[in-house]
A protein has these predicted regions:
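Short, low-complexity N-terminal intrinsically disordered segments enriched in polar/charged residues
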Residues: 1-29, 33, 37-41
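Charge-dense, low-complexity intrinsically disordered segments
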Residues: 6, 10, 51-54, 112
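Short structured motifs
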Residues: 20, 76-80, 120-121
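A solvent-exposed, acidic/Ser-Thr-rich amphipathic alpha-helical stretch
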Residues: 32-102
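Transmembrane beta-barrel outer-membrane domains
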Residues: 74, 114-116
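Short beta-strand edge/turn micro-motifs at domain boundaries
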Residues: 91-93, 116-149
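Short, surface-exposed loop/helix-turn segments at secondary-structure junctions
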Residues: 104-111, 152
Length: 153
């Protein structure tokens, strides 16, 4: 990994790390409109390695609302940032660890089953007038320990 050349580049790296963390916070708080501050309006997102969808940001955002609505608890953590900046474009690869809880049944007060996912977010970013935004995300799920309850879709 090349070292940052100046304070401006350090600022960009910190801004990108903050953006990636903002994604996690928005997802875990189920504040999906905050994702508008993370992705470009025309971003392409691919979650298929984890069994999710692939498509344009607006459609994926709607899918996230529905899919993550099944989970009363999620915790998305990102680490090991590899960021390359070239002017107003950048690429990033970071590791993620994601424990999630899903009810064992549809009964009120059902016990929660924990599921665990780990892998990498591979992103292309662009610097806009509002700051850095992800224009492409490909999730690469490296492993999972996840047995969904029989009643879940």
């Amino acid at each position: 990994m090349t070292q940052p050349r100046n304070l401006e580049e350090l600022g960009h790296r910190i801004a990108i790390q903050d953006l990636l963390t903002s994604y996690c916070t928005a997802i875990d708080n189920k504040d999906f409109d905050k994702l508008d501050d993370v992705f470009t309006p025309d971003a392409h997102i691919d979650y298929t390695s984890a069994g999710g969808v692939k498509g344009a940001f607006p459609e994926v955002k709607d899918w996230l609302k529905k899919a993550l609505g099944l989970f009363p608890m999620t915790q998305h953590l990102v680490t090991n940032f590899e960021i390359q900046i070239d002017g107003d474009q950048a690429t990033s690869r970071c590791g993620f660890y994601n424990p999630m809880a899903i009810p064992e049944s549809s009964e009120e007060g059902a016990a929660l089953r924990l599921l665990y996912f780990g892998g990498y977010y591979n992103d292309k970013l662009t610097l806009t007038s509002d700051g850095w935004r992800i224009e492409q995300r490909i999730e690469d799920t490296a492993w999972k320990d996840a047995q969904f309850p029989e009643n879940s879709d």
